[in-house]
C-alpha cells in the first residue's frame, strides 16, 4: 500500500456512504494522531486500538451521524506520496470559509489548522474535512 493515510480516509468515506457504524483500519501512529484531531473536532465518535495476531494492531473507528446523515460530508487527501504540500502559517488554507478543518502535520505534532495558526507553526497539509 503506497498511501496508508489515504487508505484510511477512503475506508471512512466508503463506510459512511454505506451507513456503517464502525470501520476498521490497520493501526499506525500517524493514523491515530489524525483520528485524535477528527475526534477533537467532532467528526467521529471515537476509536479504539485492538491487537491482532500479526502484532500490528487495528484501529476500530466509530463513525458519527446526525439525523441519519454522515457528519463528514467531504474528506480529501491534500498532500500525497507523489506530491507533498507544505505551507507556512500565513498560507494555511481555510476550508469552506472556516466551516471545515485542515489537518496539518507540524513539528509540534498533528493538529487542526486553527491550532497550527494559534501555535504559529506550518507544516504538511495532510487532508481537509468538511
Curated annotation (Swiss-Prot):
PROSITE patterns: RIBOSOMAL_S8 (PS00053). Keywords: Ribonucleoprotein, Ribosomal protein, RNA-binding, rRNA-binding. The keyword Transferase does not apply. One of its GO terms (molecular function) is rRNA binding. Signal peptide: none annotated. InterPro entries: Ribosomal_uS8, Ribosomal_uS8_CS, Ribosomal_uS8_sf. GO terms for biological process: translation. The keyword Repeat does not apply. Pfam families: Ribosomal_S8 (PF00410). GO terms for cellular component: ribonucleoprotein complex; ribosome. It comes from the Bacteria. Part of the 30S ribosomal subunit. Contacts proteins S5 and S12. Belongs to the universal ribosomal protein uS8 family. One of the primary rRNA binding proteins, it binds directly to 16S rRNA central domain where it helps coordinate assembly of the platform of the 30S subunit. This is Small ribosomal subunit protein uS8. It comes from Cereibacter sphaeroides (strain KD131 / KCTC 12085).
Amino acid at each position: 500500500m503506497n498511501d496508508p493515510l489515504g487508505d484510511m480516509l477512503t475506508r471512512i468515506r466508503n463506510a459512511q456512504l454505506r451507513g456503517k457504524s464502525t470501520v476498521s483500519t490497520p493501526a499506525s501512529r500517524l493514523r491515530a494522531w489524525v483520528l485524535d484531531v477528527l475526534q477533537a473536532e467532532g467528526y467521529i465518535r471515537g476509536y479504539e486500538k485492538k491487537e491482532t495476531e500479526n502484532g500490528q494492531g487495528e484501529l476500530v473507528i466509530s463513525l458519527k451521524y446526525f439525523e441519519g446523515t454522515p457528519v463528514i460530508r467531504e474528506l480529501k487527501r491534500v498532500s500525497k506520496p507523489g506530491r507533498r504540500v507544505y505551507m507556512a502559517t500565513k498560507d494555511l488554507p481555510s476550508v469552506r470559509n472556516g466551516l471545515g478543518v485542515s489537518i496539518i502535520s507540524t513539528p509540534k505534532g498533528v493538529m487542526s489548522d486553527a491550532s497550527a495558526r494559534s501555535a504559529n507553526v506550518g507544516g504538511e497539509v495532510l487532508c481537509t474535512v468538511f
